[in-house]
């Protein structure tokens, strides 16, 4: 069966071919698009494919992929499958009758033509019945190659069904470790945990008892051993606990929350089973791609990606009519996360994950999380230790010249270079200047560009098509830009948390990288924060910053505030002084 790239329509289910649905040429989405010039609240739901029982009396409700391929090949190239709705286009039988895709359109996984349809068995884009049958044959062969071969006559223990109810139990190896050994392990890995009855960290993915298909997907995706945040966060998530987690940029946080989501969604009948909110479209697209890699071959597992800037019907085709995700999208991203989560069940598991945990997130966690486990790996709210940070004092008129010097420096210049600026117009102008002056291939990316343009630019960045990409903050959070070795903060970010995220585009998963930041008196309110959080990493700060009166004034105010806080605390040493002050003030009244 095919699923069109538009909203589902009711069909007669007499046979597999009649149930194929063609995509409407231009789905009407007026009034459903979000404003493209702002950051977007993104909703992603892990859903299940509906299972339809065979009708009694029928020999078989589905045919094998090879039979489907033979059936397609016996049909003329110009013959499509017509249904009871004469106003709609017939489903294309052969790939050669399908057109080539335009930029940003889905691509057939078999032949590369326009992916007009979606195979509901694999959730992949296909262009015709012919490519659907070929694709299913490929999937069947891949699944056969994953099955472990056993010697003839040897009794092989059957693997438990993937949709069997999963209960996480600590591996015997983990149980056998003493408490002091666990604490030593946490200290060596930099894992800090707060909470009641917290699960012990795992040391290997095999300690989780995942289905073999998921273990194979982990290896194919490059996950050999868990990172520190994954060691602690995965077992806690598998037990259904609420989590507030902070870890270095590029430390594997996405897989740390995706694996428990996938496992807990396997036996669920209700759809959707999980909702993931991200601050940018690009991060949502990346998370969905990683989820699909990990879910490949697992039964009835699907994803839905809902982002602003694209027509909603093609994104909503997998959701049942009773799901209210489209309503939440139309409300606009400016609604707070609290408003969205009010629509979720009261007993659902909630996980908050970030590279930085400011006070606002701590306050939000107190409202959202029930008996949470707080997990921190690395230095909280500090840049990743594998990133070499360089802070340069550069006045605004000299910024372009300094950037061109860096791009011409053979020791520093390692393309592709990611340059962050604070406004959209500045991104466009700086990108043009870089290409004109240095001759390097350059482009800009920001929220005013269409989603199709942004996707193509991001793809080009990852594939090395651009030597320099000038961006606003939309590329500053969560994205795995593994080939980026140099980041330049042309404009100092508005907060140290944003600085940590932007610097974190290099140094992914322990790789070395360099981040160069231009700073001047326009960022004077951040001087003390920079000194506190960047200097401990070994970075040399410019003397203009260290000798600035703004820095010394901010330092004095913070020290005074700390002294006031200390004096308000009641201890054995100051208890009598507090009593005397209270008696004196009472007698004066």
UniProtKB/Swiss-Prot annotation:
Organism superkingdom: Eukaryota
Chain sites annotated for binding ATP: 247-254
Keyword tags: ATP-binding, Cytoplasm, Helicase, Hydrolase, Isopeptide bond, Metal-binding, Nucleotide-binding, Nucleus, Phosphoprotein, RNA-binding, Ubl conjugation, Zinc, Zinc-finger
Segments carrying motif DEAD box: 323-326
Residue intervals of the Helicase C-terminal domain: 399-549
Bias (Basic and acidic residues): 12-27, 80-91
Region described as Disordered: spans on this chain: 1-36, 48-98
Modified-residue entries (Phosphoserine), positions: 64, 156, 160
Family: Belongs to the DEAD box helicase family. DDX59 subfamily.
Subunit record text: Interacts (via HIT-type zinc finger) with the RUVBL1/RUVBL2 complex in the presence of ADP.
Name of the protein in question: Probable ATP-dependent RNA helicase DDX59
Species, as recorded: Rattus norvegicus (Rat)
Species lineage: Eukaryota, Metazoa, Chordata, Craniata, Vertebrata
Encoding gene per record: Ddx59
